[in-house]
Amino acid sequence: MGDNRKVRVVVGGVFDILHVGHVHFLKMAKELGDELIVIVAHDETVKRRKGRPPINPAEDRAELLKSIRYVDDVVIGEPGEISIDLIKRLKPDVIALGPDQDFSCEELKKRLRKEGINAEVIRLPYLYKSDRAKTSKIIQRIIETFCE
């Protein structure tokens, strides 16, 4: 008998002001396995990393992501950096990083191996390059269109 276990892919991100670039990223990640789980960054993590709170709270971002057909489950991350405990609980076979995430694949792999997590870590390329697929550019267009 073959192994019928599903291949679990995990991605993480802020996903604030969901846009077409996010959807393309999630579709590409889903194609790496059978099950896609998204870790949505905690509001405190966003505030610390970006210097501002997210536009939408984590609960709303999670609910929006759950409505995307490529996504099988969504969890809200813990405050702080990548939670090894959360990754252990999710048991990923693959961790897919976005093209703009500032984590080193090799450093993350080393950290995971040290904790006994043997997930493959890969960085997905930009599939959809456009100002319409960058949250900061969308915010800038909103300000220029409605506030000036």
Swiss-Prot record:
It catalyses: FMN + ATP + H(+) = FAD + diphosphate. It is an enzyme of class 2 (transferase). Pathway: Cofactor biosynthesis; FAD biosynthesis; FAD from FMN: step 1/1. Its cofactor is a divalent metal cation. Keywords: ATP-binding, FAD, Flavoprotein, FMN, Nucleotide-binding, Nucleotidyltransferase, Transferase. ATP binds at V14, F15, H19, V20, G21, H22, D100. Coiled coil: none annotated. GO terms for molecular function: ATP binding; FMN adenylyltransferase activity. Its EC number is 2.7.7.2. GO terms for biological process: FAD biosynthetic process; FMN metabolic process. Belongs to the archaeal FAD synthase family. Catalyzes the transfer of the AMP portion of ATP to flavin mononucleotide (FMN) to produce flavin adenine dinucleotide (FAD) coenzyme. Homodimer. This is FAD synthase. It comes from Pyrococcus furiosus (strain ATCC 43587 / DSM 3638 / JCM 8422 / Vc1).
